[in-house]
Amino acid sequence: MFRKIIYPLVSGFCLQLSLSGADLLKPYTGPSVPGVDTSTLTGKVMAGYQGWFNCEGDGADLGWTHWSRHKDQTFGPGNVTVDLWPDVSEYDPDELYETGFRFEDGAAAKVFSSYNKKTVLRHFAWMRDYGIDGAFVQRFANGLRDPTKKAHKDEVLSHAREGANRNGRAYAVMYDLSGLPKGGTKLVETDWRELRDKMQITNDPAYLNHKGKPVVTVWGIGFMDGGKPRAYTLKECYELVRFLKADGCTVMLGVPTGWRTLDRDCAKDPLMHEI
């Protein structure tokens, strides 16, 4: 059972003709079926949905991102970043992309793209079939500075929203701050306003709430990388959490393992506990 859902959940989707940003960032008006209780996080089994795999020819113009070490070169022998090969036996032909790998009979090995709408909807259908309540759709904040990468993230989120609604699942936004420069948390504030105002994401029936408020997760607060603090500061993170809470959100954090004792991979700063 799990071999068919765990690895592909880090994907997204594809449309041969991508929607424009204006079409993506609008309220959802499609079908929505009842399913899991989206009013609470309590008791939920949620997956993390990275949506970061791309394939040459998928329409995203991001090459072989996260499949290959060099995204502008074919995903094949000597150009690999993944540890596992996905089970693609249930995908349709229009969801698969030829790689540089070959089977013994000479046939090309194929993988999925996170830019394929059909694939994202399939993943949420699998969640329904196998008892996964929903997904935290990750938005890697550092990529919000790049229009091409942001367009990809918007498309993944748009189709995850549709997949959740069509399959009675829950979804929520998870921001990953990794790689942000100093001052970069302002990108998250701007992005959240856009999702709230243009997509009206917090009014969506499939969006996860907790204690009467929409859930937003912020991952990457207080980490030390190689013994050094990250470029974006704890003070910035503090202000970001304050912003989200003032906007009426329930805020969930992703923090280092040493957060309680302020050691190991965690910044030795009491502001961590205030956050």
Stretches with model-predicted labels:
Residues 22-275:
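Glycan-processing catalytic domains of CAZymes
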Residues 1-4:
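Positively charged n-region of N-terminal signal peptides that target proteins for export
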Residues 7-18:
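Bacterial N-terminal signal peptides
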